């Protein structure tokens, strides 16, 4: 007989699709980062610096994981010229891929 554990989810939790968690093409690091990104508020600072500030991963490590997520179409990073002429990056994050 198998035990079943239930967790009461009454506050501070995230609801997300299992799609990326079950995608065998993604590494555990990519699954973890995507899950973490999906748990953040929409107005959060989605940037390489922002992600590094809340992780023990190095800048190159985060960049590598983001590249993997881009290759599998879970993340798009758009490069746009900002108001002062500097480049800015917009992150589009997908729970499901088509």
Question: Where does each model-flagged region fall?
Answer:
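Charged low-complexity intrinsically disordered patches
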Residues: 93-98
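N-terminal leader segment of winged-helix/HTH proteins
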Residues: 1-11
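Detector for methionine-enriched segments
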Residues: 1-2, 16, 37
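Winged helix-turn-helix DNA-binding recognition segment
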Residues: 20-30, 37-91
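Short, Lys/Arg-enriched N-terminal segment that forms or immediately precedes the first helix
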Residues: 10-24
């Amino acid at each position: 007989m198998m035990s079943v554990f239930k967790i009461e989810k009454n506050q501070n939790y995230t609801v997300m699709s299992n799609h990326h968690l079950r995608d065998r093409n993604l590494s555990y690091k990519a699954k973890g980062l995507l899950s973490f990104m999906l748990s953040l508020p929409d107005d959060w600072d989605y940037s390489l610096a922002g992600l590094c500030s809340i992780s023990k991963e190095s800048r190159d490590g985060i960049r590598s994981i983001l590249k993997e997520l881009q290759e599998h179409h879970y993340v798009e990073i758009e490069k746009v010229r900002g108001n002062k002429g500097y480049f800015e990056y917009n992150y589009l994050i997908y729970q499901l891929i088509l």
